[in-house]
Amino acid sequence: MDKDKIEVLGARVHNLKNIDVVIPRNSLTVFTGLSGSGKSSLAFDTIYAEGQRRYIETFSAYARNFLGNMERPDVDKITGLSPVIAIEQKTTNKNPRSTVGTTTEIYDYLRLLFARAATAYSYQSGEKMVKYTEEKVVSMILKDYLGKKIFILAPLVRNRKGHYRELFESMRRKGYLYIRIDGEIQELTQGMKTDRYKNHNIEVVVDKMKLAARLGETEDNLSQRLQKTVATAMRQGDGQVMIIDADTGEAKFFSKRLMDPVTGLSYKDPAPNIFSFNSPEGACPHCKGLGMVSEIDLKKVIPDDRKSIREGAIAPLGKYKSQMIFWQIEAILSKYDLDLKSPVKDIPQEAMDEILYGALEKVRIAKELVHTTTDYFVAFDGVVKYLRAVMEGDESAAGKKWSGQFIADVTCGECHGQRLNREALSYKIWGKNISELSEMDLGELYEWMGEVENHLGETQRQIATEIIKEIRKRIRFLLDVGLDYLSLNRQSASLSGGESQRIRLATQIGSQLVNVLYILDEPSIGLHQRDNVRLINSLKALRDLGNTVIVVEHDEDMMRAADWIVDIGPRAGRKGGEVVFQGTPQQMLHTHTLTAQYLNHERAIEVPARRRKGNGQHIALCGCTGNNLKRVDVELPLGELIVVTGVSGSGKSTLINETLQPILSQHFYRSLKKPMAYEKIEGMELIDKVVTVDQSPIGRTPRSNPATYTGVFSDIRALFVGLPEAKIRGYKPGRFSFNVKGGRCEACGGNGYKTIEMNFLPDVMVPCDVCHGKRYNRETLEVRYKGKSIADVLDMTVNMAVEFFENVPQILPKIKSLQDVGLGYLKLGQSSTTLSGGESQRVKLATELSKRDTGKTLYILDEPTTGLHFDDIRILMDVLQKLVDRGNTVLIIEHNLDVIKLADYIIDMGPEGGKRGGQVLSTGTPEAVAKSKKGFTPAFIKSVLESAAKGRE
């Protein structure tokens, strides 16, 4: 076996055609080719799957039972395989407690830094907290109170509610005679208690003494006597002692723990878990460390105040039903000479407060309604309390989904979104608490960490140096992959696929592993051209540690920087799955594969000869301040192809996906998603609908497929129902569905396969032995159109189906639209779980294309080129250009220069990411923006336009 290479022999997974591939060890290798050509099948479903299988096989049979199905990929042999780590583009963690800081473990080091080197301040007085040894406390008391009468007390309760009967009894049994309650010294008596609903401060009187030497007593003897008393007080007071001057009544606190010398407030000794919002020790008690709390949103409870309550104005209650809650509301309204038919906007606020938050007195229900001999009086707690009871009492998924319609997440009023309790937020280093550091951009935090050592004391510096060095090293890896605009408190769930992938990449570089095979799926997603060089250098750094790096990628810079390229093709789907080239980038330039033709400029996506002027109308969005936006005003010219550009984190998604799109969705579809802050929008009446086409899956079960998503499967079933054989048998459309009983194969439930449980071995998926994977029973399959059964139709590729249904006008347009967006290779019945993000997006786009448009539609696409080859981009852009030619407006967020150069109008944002971004730098045609001196995008646009001009010459 050659140790210098990894060999894949006879790979046949999905559409791969028994291919052999050689990958040099310790190289940066790029797998490229058209979308659907088989790159991911080779990288993830063959190489990674086999690596995982071999790893799992080292476990015991018992352990393997818990690790799910790891069947052997369809490949003859893979030699030279190292341990494999896949870094995919999925946002894997939806847990609201997961942040950039916790994922990268930087926050763990930050917690350690604060536990060891931070200075504590009192959240009550702002004073620096102090702590003393027992000996120091005794010497300070002697110094301050020598010759004076003092009370020595042990603090027991600080500002807490309760009757404390057991505490008083316990102190009495220990022999104590006096207790101080809320500043007043009282004799301890049997059965003593306090008002349980009030906050109390309680101290037990340990001793009363005059600090003067008795007859024949030395100063040392006095000190020892005081030390015994102080030690007793500290044992009772959990490390604290309180001294009261008997003459003046002035109180002073001393403590072995951190303590406020003014108020006596005491902190526990700092430990890393005090600074964790995932620990009860550190989390804000109100929001439990989430930074947000769920509140009932009255706008969602009463979405339309023009309706009456009888018509369903109070959404959780719905329309009038003869139920107690409606009788109670009617009784309240009758006091104001109103009834359930009155529009909510006409009901006085006082009455609405009673309806929402509860009536002050019991309401009278007429005896006729409750079928009793007398009127019925009942307390009414209000709709809001009723909703809260449902929220807290119904733990079912359906119950949570129902109550979730009326809830909004708002910033916690106690910690103001900082997640930690007051004590944790009171520790500071160079004037900053841990939450303030977590809010900084990583670039800003890196600089702060570089300077902070100069502002630490000598002892602090010695403790902190190594921790700071580790934090800076980890931040540096994140900066190197273009994530300087993120902050440590950014939720993992809010990251794009590309961002979360690059975070995992940075984490792997930081782990310093060697002899590992890394497989990455398009790490350049969402990355501006400016940051591409840094990403490539990071991948090379991973390689130079002694690892092999495989990247599934379409980016030209990445291909040119690679050591080795494997080009899969020649086309996609059944026409792909072959190795059309493997070798160095220099060798590839001398071939004529489709990829090579784009790299050596034999083919190119042409810059249009002229830019559209639009229809002269526009949508104006003003005063946007969400996230990092700085009062952004923007005009979107209608009837044009608009591209929003800018470095990662500059505010593109905030402006379009989080502000504009929710505003339009609320306007047209009454969407509940709230837009980010803005002042006004004008021109919505100029469009008639908004269509958002993203890369989320078209379905999450194997039963979903392109035919069901586009709706063409309903038309196909209707066609089969209309056939003479189906009419004779009396078949209805449900007969041709694999989701309901009747026509499907009941042996496999319409899945086409069975899952065989192997107990201590992984489950095995085998084709159904009754229907042989066709999903339907024999009777259903006997109905044929042009000699093909419904199962045969689902097994057709889109290209085959276009020919097959060319004379069926109800079906052809929907299938043709799939072909038009470059998905001719997909099978109509292909499971949606096997589609890539780019394929899912194009299925959605095809679905929208097959619908009629009025020429007044706004289409919003976020990075539609993800997962697309140069030629796929050409096909996609041709489709989008046709939409604009019909009078529609297409708005794209994009980094890809092949898309940017086709724009009629560019909105460039920046200049940087995060806090240093959030501004519109330049707008206009690509030619106009290329002349701008602001930001990084103009230089790249200028370069690509000049290259296009040379290509035309």
Regions found by a protein language model. Name each.
Residues 1-953:
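Conserved phosphate-binding elements of NTP-dependent enzyme cores
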